[in-house]
């Protein structure tokens, strides 16, 4: 055998960990083994070498993960993904439970990539390994732009492939936990009826930050937003998730049923509390105080922290899946090995045994908040730093940005010097090790996480991921130059032109207002009160830092400023 062929075969057979190491052998492409090393070994790992942490791993002292596994050779033929062909798929892990016999206890709104790599994957593990019978998922999309998802899932019997990519190999697993799918533009009534049905115990949602219609300054529902105003006026079909939740809750109240638990899986601190406040406010503004009081008194809105990097799927991913695993999937989801979910144990009408699938169930909302703060400010804050400053400098992927020495040093120093001192201390959790784990995750070259995905919807991200740290450093009198440069990079990004003069699309629900303000002057965007309030605008040190950073970005460009501030 030629040496190059042997090396290729060896590379194809390298270690890959599946979603759960305890998965039955017939579901698993191969066995795995794990070993742990001290944190000293982590620190000695070259900065450009990616090491995949175990799934659900919260970095603790004295732990380091190295997986080993092999998989079958590439298939000779391909098959379309559907229920009929499941048993014939040889190179992927497939469901063995009877999907048609499982009740749909969960309705999930927003069947995007993150949901399919996170909640749906956890539920699939429960269905496969623990004989859970009442908790499959009915997926729901509300907006017309989600029609391609409907068109992809329906012919595949709502099956899809989760492609898990580590630096040392790739695995594929067919997820079967979504057993029905409803598209609201086709039948809004069917969606409301499904939510109101007695078999529905949880309505979960991944609708992004902007889908909550919350004023970032007052934390109140934006009742003057056209979508919210239309729903409150009774226009059909509803435009917002709260229009559907309210209609379904009103029916359950009239029928004498319990409320369903509203489970936010969005990347926001206090996501459960926000969901509760927005829904109760919506009901009150709809003129139904009785239902509003009933929801407030009897409903459940658990807070959660969710984490898994999930890039956008592209045509190359589909071709690779067919070539290497023999699966023709109209819309697979690509993700990393790492995943984590910290969930408040606050449910009104039962829940699946999530902890069996690796979810960290905690009794206290403050524990969720602590994990969430660490994750949002370190992971998402660093993503924002790399995304906006990287886009301006002409980078394409996150792993390219973090591999550049200047950007890498900037991110490390921002995390260690400006963010870490503000974070809570959780017993048994090392923030230093978490930062090290993040650098490894960011460096994974196989994910190809595109910057436009990271930059999407900055008006909902910067006020959450960057501004709270700036505000706290202002109070503490601490360093904030790097954080301020990230905010300035977002202001500069909103012009839609990079440092080389190339135009790009600013994908943000507030894009018109942001760009109008950007045209007024360097820091005019800071005047948008529902994003920034009044306090930041009145702090002289911050305003001067912001002006200096913006002037530097305009004059010298992002790369030069990152180097200067690193």
Swiss-Prot record:
UniProt keyword annotations, A-Z: NAD, Oxidoreductase
Superkingdom of this protein's organism: Eukaryota
Subunit structure: Monomer.
The enzyme's E.C. designation: 1.1.1.67
Binding site for NAD(+): 106-117
GO molecular function, one term: mannitol dehydrogenase activity
InterPro entries for this protein: 6-PGluconate_DH-like_C_sf, 6PGD_dom2, Mannitol_DH, Mannitol_DH/Oxidoreductase, Mannitol_DH_C, Mannitol_DH_N, NAD(P)-bd_dom_sf
Catalytic activity line of the entry: D-mannitol + NAD(+) = D-fructose + NADH + H(+)
Pfam families: Mannitol_dh, Mannitol_dh_C
Its biological purpose: Catalyzes the NAD(H)-dependent interconversion of D-fructose and D-mannitol in the mannitol metabolic pathway.
Family to which the UniProt record says this protein belongs: Belongs to the mannitol dehydrogenase family.
Cystine pairs: none
Family matches, as SUPFAM superfamilies: 6-phosphogluconate dehydrogenase C-terminal domain-like, NAD(P)-binding Rossmann-fold domains
Organism: Pyrenophora tritici-repentis (strain Pt-1C-BFP)
Name of protein: Mannitol 2-dehydrogenase
